[in-house]
Swiss-Prot record:
<dbReference type="InterPro" id="IPR050590">
    <property type="entry name" value="Exosome_comp_Rrp42_subfam"/>
</dbReference>
<dbReference type="InterPro" id="IPR020869">
    <property type="entry name" value="Rrp42_archaea"/>
</dbReference>
<dbReference type="InterPro" id="IPR015847">
    <property type="entry name" value="ExoRNase_PH_dom2"/>
</dbReference>
<dbReference type="InterPro" id="IPR027408">
    <property type="entry name" value="PNPase/RNase_PH_dom_sf"/>
</dbReference>
<keyword id="KW-0271">Exosome</keyword>
<dbReference type="Pfam" id="PF01138">
    <property type="entry name" value="RNase_PH"/>
</dbReference>
<comment type="function">
    <text>Non-catalytic component of the exosome, which is a complex involved in RNA degradation. Contributes to the structuring of the Rrp41 active site.</text>
</comment>
<dbReference type="GO" id="GO:0035925">
    <property type="term" value="F:mRNA 3'-UTR AU-rich region binding"/>
</dbReference>
<dbReference type="InterPro" id="IPR001247">
    <property type="entry name" value="ExoRNase_PH_dom1"/>
</dbReference>
<dbReference type="InterPro" id="IPR020568">
    <property type="entry name" value="Ribosomal_Su5_D2-typ_SF"/>
</dbReference>
<comment type="subunit">
    <text>Component of the archaeal exosome complex. Forms a hexameric ring-like arrangement composed of 3 Rrp41-Rrp42 heterodimers. The hexameric ring associates with a trimer of Rrp4 and/or Csl4 subunits.</text>
</comment>
<keyword id="KW-0963">Cytoplasm</keyword>
<dbReference type="GO" id="GO:0000177">
    <property type="term" value="C:cytoplasmic exosome (RNase complex)"/>
</dbReference>
<dbReference type="GO" id="GO:0016075">
    <property type="term" value="P:rRNA catabolic process"/>
</dbReference>
<dbReference type="Pfam" id="PF03725">
    <property type="entry name" value="RNase_PH_C"/>
</dbReference>
<protein>
    <recommendedName>
        <fullName>Exosome complex component Rrp42</fullName>
    </recommendedName>
</protein>
<dbReference type="InterPro" id="IPR036345">
    <property type="entry name" value="ExoRNase_PH_dom2_sf"/>
</dbReference>
Length: 275
């Protein structure tokens, strides 16, 4: 089974002490402040054969998300909604401990957090993906690939997922004697998205809380908490990872910081998506 870099004790004690000594001065190895995000770039329509796609670079972390739409049956418990299926893969080329094969528990956890953030925020209006109530709907396959693991992959996965959804084309549906079929020659619009959503992760290293940890920082962190926000700053997801603990004061401070960062991140995301 693959293991995430943060599970590997690869940072020598002397290097950890060096990193923490920088935290004491309010700075980090790459020159960022403790509350700074790494540079973000988004390339839309990166995978030309997908219905929508986006390549996200967050520092050295690189994630590609792509969508495919197909006509499908609705789930029995949601006959008047389309379907959203999120998959995440940690490709072996992304990090030395990632192995080929089916998604492991780390990839499954990432997919669940991204899925939950999208659903609970109602970013995608599934009710508008119905073709024939109770019989035919659109299924949106959202596949996310981690190409380079440079730390804080969850935030990058959320950004790539949202960007790919906004980039997705919806094709004309035609009906004949055999039922519904997709006419790929005619685009009728985009997915019915209500708003974007972002995830902001805060790592705790000793007594310090740091935004958007890179690979070295994740390797020495005690724990990490991630908050997902809508543009009105409603929390639509919280995820804790790592073996360490956080006090209520830590969580409160982390959320206050994440909220401020989310405002800037949402502005940057909207700017790069042109929405």
């Amino acid at each position: 089974m693959s293991s995430t870099p943060s599970n590997q004790n690869i940072i020598p004690l002397i290097k950890k002490e060096s990193i923490v000594s920088l935290f004491e001065k309010g700075t980090r190895q790459d020159g960022r402040k403790l509350t700074d995000y790494r540079p973000l770039s988004i390339t839309l329509n990166y995978a030309k054969k997908a219905d929508g796609s986006a390549l996200v670079k967050l520092g050295t972390t690189m994630v590609l998300a792509g969508t495919k739409l197909e006509i499908d049956k609705p789930y029995e418990d949601t006959p008047n909604q389309g379907n959203l299926i999120v998959n995440v893969e940690l490709l072996p080329l992304a990090y030395e401990t990632f192995e080929p094969g089916p998604p492991d528990e780390n990839a499954i956890e990432l997919a669940r957090v991204v899925d939950r953030s999208l659903r609970d925020s109602k970013a995608l209006d599934l009710t508008k993906l119905v073709i024939e109530p109770g019989k035919s709907v659109w299924t949106v396959w959202l596949d996310v690939y981690v190409l380079d693991y440079g730390g804080n992959v969850l935030d990058a996965c959320t950004l790539a997922s949202v960007a790919a959804l906004y980039n997705t084309k919806v094709y004309k549906v035609e009906q004949d004697s055999n039922g519904f079929r997709v006419n790929k020659n005619e685009v009728v619009g985009k997915l019915p998205l209500n708003h974007p959503v972002v995830t902001v992760s805060i790592a705790k290293v000793d007594k310090y809380l740091i935004v958007d940890p890179d690979l070295d920082e994740e390797s020495i962190m005690d724990t990490k908490v991630s908050f997902s926000y809508t543009p009105d700053l409603k929390i639509v997801g919280i995820q804790k990872s790592g073996k360490g603990s956080m006090s209520l004061q830590d969580i409160d401070q982390a959320e206050n910081t994440a909220r401020l960062v989310a405002v800037k991140l949402l502005e940057e995301l909207k700017k790069q998506l042109g929405i």
